[in-house]
């Protein structure tokens, strides 16, 4: 169990620097990567392509965004009340 956690920590990669968001506050970066992931996933699904190319965006928003925000946004997408353009 402890070895598994050590392996996860060792292999964990955080979000890389994005020059569009140079400030300390990364809220907009979180939001943009969440939108980009869902847009990419929607576009690749429509084309019949492989959605694994969108995985980078998912890793970045999972690294930056609080879990409560992501779950709330996922709920809003499911309800059809999400404010962002996907």
Curated annotation (Swiss-Prot):
Q: InterPro entries attached here?
A: COX6B-like, CX6/COA6-like_sf, Cyt_c_oxidase_su6B
What pathway, per the record? Energy metabolism; oxidative phosphorylation
The answer to whether keyword Mitochondrion applies is yes
Q: Write down the CDD domains for this protein, in alphabetical order.
A: Cyt_c_Oxidase_VIb
Q: Subcellular localization, per the record?
A: Mitochondrion inner membrane
Question: What sequence ranges are listed for the domain CHCH?
Answer: 27-73
Q: Name one GO cellular component term.
A: mitochondrial inner membrane
Q: List the disulfide bonds.
A: 30-65, 40-54
Top-rank taxon of the source lineage equals Eukaryota
Principal location class: mitochondrion
Per the annotation, the residue ranges of the short sequence motif Cx10C motif are 54-65
Carrying N6-acetyllysine, the residues are: 62
N-acetylalanine sites (modified residues): 2
Q: Which UniProt keywords apply?
A: Acetylation, Disulfide bond, Membrane, Mitochondrion, Mitochondrion inner membrane
Q: How does it sit in the membrane?
A: Peripheral membrane protein
Record-stated family: Belongs to the cytochrome c oxidase subunit 6B family.
Q: What does this protein do?
A: Component of the cytochrome c oxidase, the last enzyme in the mitochondrial electron transport chain which drives oxidative phosphorylation. The respiratory chain contains 3 multisubunit complexes succinate dehydrogenase (complex II, CII), ubiquinol-cytochrome c oxidoreductase (cytochrome b-c1 complex, complex III, CIII) and cytochrome c oxidase (complex IV, CIV), that cooperate to transfer electrons derived from NADH and succinate to molecular oxygen, creating an electrochemical gradient over the inner membrane that drives transmembrane transport and the ATP synthase.
Quaternary state and partners of this protein? Answer: Component of the cytochrome c oxidase (complex IV, CIV), a multisubunit enzyme composed of 14 subunits. The complex is composed of a catalytic core of 3 subunits MT-CO1, MT-CO2 and MT-CO3, encoded in the mitochondrial DNA, and 11 supernumerary subunits COX4I, COX5A, COX5B, COX6A, COX6B, COX6C, COX7A, COX7B, COX7C, COX8 and NDUFA4, which are encoded in the nuclear genome.
Protein name in UniProt: Cytochrome c oxidase subunit 6B1
């Amino acid at each position: 169990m402890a070895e598994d956690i050590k392996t996860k920590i060792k292999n964990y990669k955080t979000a890389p620097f994005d020059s569009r968001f140079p400030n300390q506050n990364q809220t907009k970066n979180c939001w943009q990567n969440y939108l980009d992931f869902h847009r990419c996933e929607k576009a690749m699904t429509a084309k019949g392509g492989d959605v694994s190319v969108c995985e980078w965006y998912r890793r970045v928003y999972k690294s930056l965004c609080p879990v409560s925000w992501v779950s709330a946004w996922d709920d809003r997408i499911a309800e059809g009340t999400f404010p962002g353009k996907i």
